[in-house]
């Protein structure tokens, strides 16, 4: 028979004590002799059997023991130290040996049993046998050979920090010999309530998984299983819908599959569960949907609780971190002990720690000195302030009282302009659009751009704005009355006008002469031969190719005047310089719009005299038509910088700037468009131009827009009137 199923496994000797206050003598054990003798003790008559312990009484804590629950407790008859009781008043007929067996774990030596007092009582033998989960009360009897020991030793085991202490139950007034602490590798958890006090044969109740899941407290276990299974489903079956309800369905399914085939892997179990789920009706699924809803509520509540605990912990950690570390208490120094203030502080530290955060700053005030600003920093600050005071008003924003009185209006407007964040963001958005930038470049004042991009240390933007605004408010006649300094330095004679041509003021050609007078020093006399004129025209074409893109497409616009067919020369100027590409000229003051305004009245007079109105000019579809017709006739390769719209043929892709700037009328915008057509018309090569002799009054300066338009047409339509040509073009389209 296996000894581990019969006795407790103890690594050290056992001392057993039972109560018998009426006994006069004790039986002692002498471990030194092989067969020791003991003092005889009369055996008392049997005492009345006590009432068994009721189930509502608190039982003593028990631990798991290595005793089989189905077998009675039988003392082994192995050789050991016998306990002999000799006859007394009751006079037993024979001495019955009682062996106390000491057992230990394998591999450890057996230690001798020390002297122990044993008292026998007339109570039934009771032994509490714990199980794996619950503990039941077992009733066992001794063999028939030991009839005189018809009592049961009520022993209890009290766990104290991982040790066992064997003591008597119920307690006695005699001195009790306790067991030496013994460490056990088995579970010492306290069993659940309701597992004690049951009478009858030895019965051990174990909580199987079925019983655990059938109890109300198994909801928590199912909730944890549901969370784990839901994670597995999301990992292995991501395409599954209703993961929560399907996970609830898998709880019993996976349990059944695990019982039938424990070696089945998780993926196979999930696939089989999915097949069963697909075969389940919607009515049968309702219970799992309800369960999943409850579990989802539990999970959300748990997450909220966890977040709340994290917040509380973080707050506690911050509070602990902000509290200054307390210095360890020190013995008061003799010189400090005489001061009453320091003594009171010491007492407060020892009695009430809550006042420590309030007294801590007082110490700092006494020990630390206030921080002083270094003189170097003060000096540097003063230098920076002096340097800022030397900036003009536009940078620092600070103005003197006189300037504030004089320029109160413009300053307030500028401040509002720079302080409006929405306006600045809108301007940035517009500047990011290419079409808008091209439109602005067509009307922006080049003088303003030149001043902004210049390297001058001080720029008075307000004064420049005033000058430009004043210039724009002037009429064409007032602008034409302004003197040109180039005319004063160098004499420019105006040729007699053609009698058949309309009269144009002499100052109309002033801008062109003013710009070209500083570059060319050689004049050309009127009436040159046709050969000389043609050679010079060819030289002009060659020089047009050498003109840089900055001169052609820079911020300096051009002004080309249209002419009549009957009068090829509208403006006769004795000084004719080399045209700067497409008949353009350099222009420093004013803007393109301003220059177009100056010749507005003259162009309108020409249109009236030629019976051409601005509405007739707008009959053309777009600038793309002119670009396409002119560039097909160009024999030489035009640089890409010359015209950025070379590859464009759609009218919508080419910007048509017509801004409304301070009361600009639509007529003036149309004039600016006609001016732009004249610019593109100047690209007609010289080979296609008719070589008119001096008798026809050919001007060797820039060609007019009407001349360019006629030159671009075939020679057979050379002498057709303009109105007829336009009507034919309309019929063609």
Swiss-Prot record:
Q: Where is this region: Disordered?
A: 187-207, 489-535, 691-733
Q: Which residues lie in Basic residues bias regions? A: 715-733
Q: What InterPro entries does its record include?
A: NUT, NUT_N
Q: Which PANTHER family match?
A: NUT FAMILY MEMBER 1 (PTHR22879), NUT FAMILY MEMBER 2A-RELATED (PTHR22879:SF14)
Q: Record's family?
A: Belongs to the NUT family.
Q: What is this protein called?
A: NUT family member 2
Organism expressing this protein natively:
Mus musculus (Mouse)
The organism's taxonomic lineage, starting at the top = Eukaryota, Metazoa, Chordata, Craniata, Vertebrata
């Amino acid at each position: 028979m296996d000894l581990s199923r019969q006795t407790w496994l103890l690594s050290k000797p056992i001392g057993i004590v039972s109560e018998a206050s009426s006994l006069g003598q004790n039986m002692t054990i002498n471990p030194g002799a092989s067969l020791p003798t003991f003092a005889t003790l009369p055996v008392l008559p049997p005492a009345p059997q006590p009432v068994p312990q009721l189930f509502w009484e608190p039982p003593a804590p028990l631990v798991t023991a290595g005793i089989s629950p189905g077998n009675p407790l039988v003392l082994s008859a192995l050789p050991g130290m016998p306990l002999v009781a000799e006859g007394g008043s009751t006079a037993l007929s024979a001495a019955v040996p009682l062996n106390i067996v000491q057992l230990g774990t394998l591999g450890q030596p057996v230690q001798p049993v020390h002297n122990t007092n044993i008292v026998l009582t007339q109570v039934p033998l009771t032994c509490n046998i714990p199980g794996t989960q619950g503990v039941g009360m077992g009733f066992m009897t001794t063999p028939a050979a030991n009839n005189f020991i018809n009592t049961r030793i009520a022993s209890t085991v009290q766990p104290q920090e991982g040790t066992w202490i064997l003591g008597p139950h119920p307690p006695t007034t005699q001195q009790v010999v306790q067991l030496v602490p013994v460490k056990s590798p088995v579970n010492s958890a306290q069993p659940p309530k309701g597992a004690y006090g049951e009478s009858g044969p030895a019965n051990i109740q174990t909580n199987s998984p079925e019983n655990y899941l059938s109890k109300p407290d198994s909801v928590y276990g199912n909730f944890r299983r549901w969370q784990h299974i839901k994670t597995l489903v999301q990992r292995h079956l991501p395409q599954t819908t209703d993961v929560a309800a399907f996970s609830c369905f898998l709880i019993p399914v996976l349990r059944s599959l695990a019982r039938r085939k424990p070696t089945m892997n998780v993926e196979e179990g999930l696939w089989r569960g999915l097949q069963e789920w697909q075969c389940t009706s919607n009515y049968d699924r309702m219970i799992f949907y309800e369960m999943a809803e409850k579990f989802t509520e539990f999970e959300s509540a748990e997450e909220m609780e966890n977040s709340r605990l994290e917040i509380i912990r973080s707050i506690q950690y911050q509070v602990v971190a902000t509290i200054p570390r307390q210095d360890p208490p020190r013995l008061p120094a003799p010189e400090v002990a005489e001061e009453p203030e320091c003594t009171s502080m010491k007492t407060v530290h020892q009695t009430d720690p809550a006042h420590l955060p309030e007294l801590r700053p007082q110490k700092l005030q006494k020990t630390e000195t206030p921080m002083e600003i270094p003189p170097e920093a003060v000096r540097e600050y003063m230098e920076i302030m002096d340097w800022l005071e030397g900036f003009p008003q536009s940078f620092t924003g600070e103005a003197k009282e006189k300037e504030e009185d004089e320029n109160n209006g413009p300053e307030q407007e500028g401040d509002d302009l720079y302080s409006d964040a929405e306006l600045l963001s809108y301007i940035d958005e517009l500047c990011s659009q290419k079409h808008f930038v091209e439109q602005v470049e067509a009307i922006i004042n080049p003088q303003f751009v030149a001043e902004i991009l210049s390297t001058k240390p001080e720029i008075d933007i307000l004064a420049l704005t005033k000058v430009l605004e004043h210039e724009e408010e002037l009429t064409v006649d007032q602008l034409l009355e302004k003197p040109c300094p180039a005319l004063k330095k160098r004499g420019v004679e105006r040729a007699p006008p053609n009698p058949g041509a309309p009269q144009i003021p002499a100052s109309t050609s002033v801008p062109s002469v003013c710009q070209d007078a500083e570059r060319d020093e050689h004049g050309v006399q009127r009436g040159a031969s046709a050969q000389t004129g043609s050679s010079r025209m060819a030289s002009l074409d060659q020089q047009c190719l050498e003109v840089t893109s900055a001169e052609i497409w820079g911020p300096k616009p051009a002004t080309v005047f249209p002419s009549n067919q009957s009068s090829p020369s509208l403006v006769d100027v004795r000084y004719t310089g080399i045209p700067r590409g497409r008949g353009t000229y350099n222009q420093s003051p004013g803007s393109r719009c301003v220059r177009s305004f100056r010749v507005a009245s003259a162009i309108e007079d020409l249109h009236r005299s030629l019976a051409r109105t601005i509405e007739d000019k707008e009959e053309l579809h777009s600038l793309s038509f002119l670009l396409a017709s002119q560039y097909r006739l160009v024999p030489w390769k035009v640089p890409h910088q010359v015209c950025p719209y070379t590859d464009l043929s759609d009218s919508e892709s080419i910007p048509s700037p017509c801004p409304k700037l301070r009361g600009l009328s639509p007529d003036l915008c149309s004039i600016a468009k006609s001016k732009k057509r004249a610019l593109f018309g100047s690209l007609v090569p010289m080979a296609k131009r008719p070589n008119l002799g001096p008798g026809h009054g050919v001007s060797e300066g820039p060609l007019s827009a009407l001349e360019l338009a006629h030159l671009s047409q075939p020679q057979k339509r050379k002498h057709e009137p303009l109105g007829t040509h336009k009507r034919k073009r309309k019929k063609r389209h």
